[in-house]
Amino acid sequence: MDLLQLHCPPTEAYYRPEVFDALDELKQAGKIQHYGVSVEKVEEALKASEYPGVATVQIIFNIFRQRPKELFFPLAQKRDVGILVRLPLASGLLGGKITRNTQFAADDHRSYNRYGERFDRGETFSGVDLDVALDAVEQIRRIVPADVSMAAFAMRWVLQHEEVSCVIPGARNADQVIENAKASDLAPLSSEQMQMLTKIYQDEIRPLVHQRW
């Protein structure tokens, strides 16, 4: 196996060296080439990066979840840890097609976990209240060029950060896969666009989520 990742183990697992010793043994036995973790919080990413064998960290990072770039990204770059970004569109919010009238299926986490009823709230809409998020989406929409989809624009923002190794967007059909792939072909966002997006985050989103994840 090329890469084995532990998906969102409880925080205490990162403080148990024997967990990572076991992964080292799998690597030494030739069962896996590399291993990493998928985390909920920046704290977990920082702790995981202390283990020399950790090759990758998968983390939520998007326009609505910017804390990882403050502490974790510089450390990951220093220690040569690959960053795999999941939920780059904040559960579809940053695709620009969700409205207050959107109905989600009963088995869709955007229906049953909006407030963290089943698992970590940060996994659904990046932990942002839907009404607040939709207002912010409308502000972002005004920044997106007319010939670019909002989804591609949002992922281009993620790719703008050189520490990011790979982006893992979700897709429900082939058209969405094609649209997602266009993000890598877009020109970098301008400094003005980046500043405007930062201001939206600072004003609307940061007070709600920044210290939680």
Where do the model's predicted regions map?
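Beta/alpha (TIM)-barrel catalytic core signal, keyed to glycine-rich beta->alpha loops juxtaposed to Asp/Glu
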Residues: 8-202
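Disulfide-rich extracellular domains of secreted proteins
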Residues: 196, 212-213
